[in-house]
């Protein structure tokens, strides 16, 4: 009788552990979502929007830089950057193309920051294009700032989501984390650098009587270019 009771207890325990395991895993051994269901598609779409907006911002920076390069006689550098802009436009939403252009923009602006604009800027070319350059750079700064804030929010949400989603969705969420982490870490320094670069251009423009766009005009242009 005692032996039968022991067997009965073991069977009950085995069934209990099977039920507990089933609560945590589905029949395919995948972890179930806990609590509120994660909108993986929503996270992915927000990630894609971030990349598009950063790409738009960086293209705007690059176009503004090209105008300055041409005004200081850096024709070869301007042509090379134009090709990079065309490549980025052909690959809309491509994270690698965006990263490459971010790097090129940072290098180009760093090179131009070493130049004495008063001595090397062609004043006639500056009168024609400097206002537009300042506008494009201002647009990029605004779009970068918005993207950096949104990326920080998305990074926190996607990291929390990774603890809840199934194994089959984990890879997609990790991709979102990588995108948002890149933007949250790399884009604020770019925006700050370009803002300082723009300040130097504005100072030169004011010194030489060249009109500059208003803050309202820059914001209006940025709003028209931002993807929501």
Model-derived segments and spans:
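Immediate post-signal-peptide N-terminus of mature secreted/exported proteins
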Residues: 24-94, 224-228
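Extended amphipathic alpha-helical interaction segments
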Residues: 99-227
């Amino acid at each position: 009788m005692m032996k039968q009771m022991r067997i009965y207890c073991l069977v009950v325990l085995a069934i209990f552990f099977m039920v507990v395991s089933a609560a945590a895993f589905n029949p395919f051994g995948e972890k179930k979502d806990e609590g509120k269901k994660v909108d993986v598609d929503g996270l992915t779409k927000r990630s894609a929007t971030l990349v598009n907006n950063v790409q738009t911002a960086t293209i705007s920076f690059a176009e503004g830089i090209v105008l300055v390069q041409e005004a200081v006689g850096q024709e070869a550098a301007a042509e090379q950057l134009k090709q990079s802009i065309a490549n980025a436009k052909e690959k809309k939403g491509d994270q690698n193309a965006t990263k490459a252009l971010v790097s090129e923009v940072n290098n180009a602006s760093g090179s131009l920051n070493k130049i004495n604009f008063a001595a090397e800027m062609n004043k006639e070319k500056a009168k024609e294009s400097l206002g537009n350059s300042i506008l494009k750079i201002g647009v990029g700064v605004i779009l970068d700032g918005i993207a950096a804030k949104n990326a920080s929010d998305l990074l926190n949400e996607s990291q929390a989501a990774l603890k809840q989603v199934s194994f089959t969705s984990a890879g997609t969420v990790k991709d979102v984390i990588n995108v948002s982490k890149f933007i949250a870490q790399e884009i604020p320094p770019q925006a700050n650098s370009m803002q300082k670069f723009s300040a130097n251009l504005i100072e030169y423009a004011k010194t030489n009587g060249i009109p500059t766009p208003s803050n309202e005009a820059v914001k209006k242009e940025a709003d028209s270019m931002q993807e929501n």
